Amino acid sequence: MASSMLGFLLLLLLLMAAHPGPSEAQHWSHGWYPGGKRASNSPQDPQSALRPPAPSAAQTAHSFRSAALASPEDSVPWEGRTTAGWSLRRKQHLMRTLLSAAGAPRPAAVPIKP
């Protein structure tokens, strides 16, 4: 048992002595100074980081929604969407039903020419 413990300690000492130094995956605070300031040569420096090119004004304007370019169903308010596809006969029937339920006098039927 003593020899296995000695072997383990010897292996641990060998690994610690042969350590190559800091790895590429360093702690998040590497390169930071007290007060939240970064070292200017730090790879996390915002000036040294590559940034994607900014989109052109035309691309930005094209990404915004326009009422002129909206599809017809998007331009109809939600109240009108429920009856937008209904025929005139269905709408008249709905109005008669609502008016008769409210107790209002029933309007005369208007003949529809086919």
UniProtKB/Swiss-Prot annotation:
Midbrain. Belongs to the GnRH family. The keyword Cytoplasm does not apply. Keywords: Amidation, Cleavage on pair of basic residues, Hormone, Secreted, Signal. This is Progonadoliberin-2. PANTHER family: GONADOLIBERIN, PROGONADOLIBERIN-2. Residues 22-80 are annotated as: Disordered. The modification Glycine amide is found at residue 35. It is found in: Secreted. Residues 1-25 form the signal peptide. Pfam families: GnRH. The gene is GNRH2. GO terms for cellular component: extracellular space. One of its GO terms (molecular function) is gonadotropin hormone-releasing hormone activity. InterPro entries: GnRH, Gonadoliberin. The keyword Nucleus does not apply. Stimulates the secretion of gonadotropins; it stimulates the secretion of both luteinizing and follicle-stimulating hormones.
